Amino acid sequence: MIEKIVIANRGEIAVRIIRSCREMGIRSVALFSEADRMSKHVMLADEAYPIGPAPSKESYLDVDKIIETALKCGADAVHPGYGFLSENAGFARKCEVAGITFIGPRAETIERMGDKISALRSMTEAGVPVVPGIQRQLESATEAERICREIGLPVILKAASGGGGKGMRLIRSESEIGEAYAAAKSEALSSFGDETVYIEKYIEEPHHIEFQILGDAHGNIVHLYDRECSVQRRHQKIVEESPSPFLTDELRQEMGKTAAAAARAVGYVGAGTIEFLVDKNRNFYFLEMNTRLQVEHPVTEEVLGLDLVKEQIYIASGRPLHLRQTDIVQRGHSIECRICAEDADNGFMPSPGLVKQVTEPNGLGI
């Protein structure tokens, strides 16, 4: 069993991981940049070590420094949290080489599912429905025009290494193709260091529904049901809820089985999320897989009564899943909202400040 975990992150997710470590009797190690010396996660952890200056590239993204610190303090595992290095295959691989357990999937799985074109190919081979389009690099605007005529407008261009809505362009008329293609490639390169883009049919009025999954090193896979995240702005999630009010019981079961099959097809180990688009006729299509714990994971925890961080740690320790699919039942309803610190009277410009008062809802069952 893992005995000491370095948390390669900061803020809310670091505090969240420390809580589970404490309940499991596992020592937690916080890392902090110069700017985070007095942060809450530093105060709560059993041990804390500096890893560099305030800029993330020189601290929380410094792979060698993190591994060096983990070895120095005698940790046997690293939890990447979300963001930063959580989906960095190189980091996972270096942890393995150093003899440190990476609490997450294997490096090759991160690579395979992190590239959206590779992920689509894997899902097609596994018989998982995908959105019509091409499963390779789009070579030119001229090729985009030809594909648009084949599958019909509207279409969407996406960055193969993308996420967070970056490197995406919606095309509703052929006159937009040239400009959209150039813009998508440019944004993909600046955001992800990879200008590869692909094209697929744009699903009108979709519901964005994701399924949480867990897989162990013994080949066992379960799904932990659904979260709906259709309320978005700039392709970024604003509201998450579980269960989805859009799904029927039959469709929920079918999508859950498909999500588990998708994870099984790539030999997934750890906690992950299979994301789907569901059209207005309730046809569903694979969108992408997140090979990490997500910000919104507590939505699932609330309706299932599970601690996903603990499950991650048990899996990373080599234990088989203690959950059977028939044991997992949703109870109640859970909603998580993102608060955007923006000025609505000034073009929604960023407007950070101090939250002076919070009134939490209360009542029976809340």
Cite the ranges covered by each PLM segment.
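Short beta->alpha connector loops of Rossmann-like oxidoreductase domains
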Residues: V130
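ATP-binding N-terminal substructure of ATP-dependent carboxylate-amine bond-forming enzymes
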Residues: M1-E125, L138-R146
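N-terminal nucleotide-binding beta1-loop-alpha1 segment
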Residues: A159
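Alpha-helix initiation/capping motif
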Residues: S59, F84, R112, Q137, ...
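Acidic/histidine-enriched active-site and ligand-binding environments that engage anionic O-linkages
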Residues: R146-I156
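ATP-dependent carboxylate activation and anion-phosphoryl transfer catalytic cores
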Residues: I7-E23, A48, L71-C73, E96, ...
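Conserved beta3 strand of the protein kinase N-lobe
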Residues: G133-I134
